[in-house]
Curated annotation (Swiss-Prot):
GO cellular component, one term: extracellular region
Cellular compartment(s): Secreted
Site residues, Reactive bond: 8-9
Superkingdom assignment: Eukaryota
Secreted keyword on record: yes
UniProt KW tRNA processing keyword: no
Free-text note on domains in this protein's UniProt record: The presence of a 'disulfide through disulfide knot' structurally defines this protein as a knottin.
Organism classification: Eukaryota, Viridiplantae, Streptophyta, Embryophyta, Tracheophyta
Name assigned to this protein: Trypsin inhibitor 3
Length: 32
């Protein structure tokens, strides 16, 4: 399967749109 494109940068988030590229906002409050 295709991997999501997600830069390995620790970014805080409240929702997926706070994150770069195809990262999603994970339960611990950071993009991944």
């Amino acid at each position: 399967h295709e991997e999501r494109v997600c830069p390995k940068i620790l970014m805080e988030c409240k929702k997926d749109s706070d994150c770069l590229a195809e990262c999603i906002c994970l339960e611990h409050g950071y993009c991944g």
